[in-house]
């Protein structure tokens, strides 16, 4: 899609300038194999595993308080399990950092007609993730 192309280009530009820190996590070393897909020009790549078999032992959100306190973070872009996104988005909000979340929903039709992918708006109503998203300002959706 055009949106994903724009995102990829922006990520490549930021990473090339050494301005992007990426935090990834998984249950174990086998689940973070995709760490090698990120550009080597990142400012920082932080890897966490629940069992400590690779990187820092713990959940990915466990490194955010220190990262937010010690680094100049302009924006957080989060995807993953709902509870992790909710926790990370709240940490970003508490630190005064703009945050976007990528909502994962089953999408039946891709046009918003079937309503299989709806998520609640923070101020009431619903978003159709397939039509309105899938990326949203974290303050505008209920996580």
Show which residues each predicted segment covers.
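Conserved S-adenosyl-L-methionine
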Residues: 13-20, 43
């Amino acid at each position: 899609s055009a949106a994903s192309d724009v995102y990829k280009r922006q990520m490549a530009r930021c990473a090339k300038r050494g301005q992007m820190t990426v935090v990834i996590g998984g249950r174990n070393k086998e689940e973070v194999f995709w760490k090698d897909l990120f550009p080597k020009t990142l400012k920082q790549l932080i890897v966490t595993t629940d069992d400590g078999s690779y990187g820092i032992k713990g959940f990915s959100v466990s490194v955010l308080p220190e990262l937010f306190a010690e680094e100049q973070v302009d924006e957080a872009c989060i995807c993953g399990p709902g509870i992790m996104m909710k926790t990370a988005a709240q940490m970003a909000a508490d630190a005064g950092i703009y945050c976007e979340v990528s909502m994962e929903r089953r999408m039946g039709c891709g046009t918003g007609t079937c309503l299989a992918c709806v998520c609640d708006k923070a101020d009431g109503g619903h978003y159709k993730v397939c039509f309105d998203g899938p990326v949203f300002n974290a303050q505008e959706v209920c996580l």
